[in-house]
Curated annotation (Swiss-Prot):
Positions of post-translational Phosphoserine modification: S36
Keyword Phosphoprotein: yes
Protein name per UniProt: Small muscular protein
Function according to Swiss-Prot or TrEMBL: Plays a role in the regulatory network through which muscle cells coordinate their structural and functional states during growth, adaptation, and repair.
Length: 85
């Protein structure tokens, strides 16, 4: 039986929490965006056609649906038990 130093075991156990691909190039944190934004007119709100798409967002088939409209309609619905029909 060969005896291995205990320090090797501790070193291996300490590296368990390193995520996969952490040492690959470009795996660091993305660069921070600048805080300054170009001045826009406050009186003209942006419409849905003028909004820029979010980077990395997938384009799904079909019309764009506003989530708040669905939530408003859903809040107006009520449960009707089978006996009251």
């Amino acid at each position: 039986m060969s005896k291995q130093p205990i320090s090797n075991v501790r070193a291996i156990q300490a590296n368990i929490n390193i995520p996969m691909g952490a040492f690959r190039p470009g795996a660091g944190q993305p660069p921070r965006r600048k805080e300054s934004t170009p001045e826009t007119e406050e009186g003209a709100p942006t419409t849905s056609e003028e909004k820029k798409p979010i980077p990395g967002m997938k384009k799904f088939p079909g019309p764009v649906v506003n989530l708040s409209e669905i939530q408003n309609v859903k809040s107006e619905l009520k449960f009707v038990p089978k006996g009251e029909q």
